[in-house]
Amino acid sequence: MGLSDWELAAARAAIARGLDEDLRYGPDVTTLATVPASATTTASLVTREAGVVAGLDVALLTLNEVLGTNGYRVLDRVEDGARVPPGEALMTLEAQTRGLLTAERTMLNLVGHLSGIATATAAWVDAVRGTKAKIRDTRKTLPGLRALQKYAVRTGGGVNHRLGLGDAALIKDNHVAAAGSVVDALRAVRNAAPDLPCEVEVDSLEQLDAVLPEKPELILLDNFAVWQTQTAVQRRDSRAPTVMLESSGGLSLQTAATYAETGVDYLAVGALTHSVRVLDIGLDM
């Protein structure tokens, strides 16, 4: 898929932090003691479980940082987005052994985390297949890793929500409390940022009824039951069909299809980035 400039910068920063954590107290003493300086090896990144791969370019950037571009050679690799079975070699390379072992943990931490996100996203995408609903991430990301986490969501077949606070407006309950009402908040945002897409969170059908005539780009249905979501879709379709609807809160893989079948446009899944399990990947020499 390839990393954007923003994602490349985020990857380099994450790699620098990871290597600093490993090396700030001194060099890799175990490797220096056990591996001759001239040693080279052939090694593979191997997944211990089925999943969707993401972050192999980040692995290469890690090797670049430790070994330089001439310190290793890639013999074979799969592409990000590939669905792989347990035991699959994701990438095989020849490398200077000391540098490879020094880079190993930073490389595996990032690839395992990003592949875990891609794998989880793909499971959600599979759960809603056959409906029009798309799986979308949130800003519930780990500090410093948002760009890479959102890349991994796309790699798994999901779509990205806003990247920050300035590329779209999202009116939530605290904004409503400050403005006085949900409609007042929406009008204030449109007056302040008329060129930005505006989304509004509602927590009741009454709030939905108040917002629909204003026709924001999207209405987020916060913790709606399935029957409420069905009603919201019916009202949207009859009153403001251009407005998109997103279900958020209380969703699970088990209920994803039920919500998607109501006709909403998106399911917002914060767990894709804030609490995902890593994909178990190891380095085999």
Curated annotation (Swiss-Prot):
Family named by the database record: Belongs to the NadC/ModD family.
Record-given protein name: Nicotinate-nucleotide pyrophosphorylase [carboxylating]
Pathway in which the depicted protein is active: Cofactor biosynthesis; NAD(+) biosynthesis; nicotinate D-ribonucleotide from quinolinate: step 1/1
Organism lineage: Bacteria, Bacillati, Actinomycetota, Actinomycetes, Mycobacteriales
Pfam families: QRPTase_C, QRPTase_N
Role of this protein: Involved in the catabolism of quinolinic acid (QA).
EC class (word): transferase
InterPro entries: Aldolase_TIM (IPR013785), NadC (IPR004393), NadC/ModD (IPR027277), Nicotinate_pribotase-like_C (IPR036068), Quinolinate_PRibosylTase_N_sf (IPR037128), Quinolinate_PRibosylTrfase_C (IPR002638), Quinolinate_PRibosylTrfase_N (IPR022412)
Keyword Glycosyltransferase: yes
Listed GO biological process terms: NAD biosynthetic process; quinolinate catabolic process
Record has Glycosyltransferase as a keyword: yes
Catalytic activity: nicotinate beta-D-ribonucleotide + CO2 + diphosphate = quinolinate + 5-phospho-alpha-D-ribose 1-diphosphate + 2 H(+)
Entry keyword set: Glycosyltransferase, Pyridine nucleotide biosynthesis, Transferase
Any GO MF annotation of the entry: nicotinate-nucleotide diphosphorylase (carboxylating) activity
Assembly description: Homodimer. Hexamer formed by 3 homodimers.
EC annotation from Swiss-Prot or TrEMBL: 2.4.2.19
Cellular component, GO, one term: peptidoglycan-based cell wall
Binding site for substrate: 105, 138-140, 162, 172, 201, 222, 248-250, 269-271
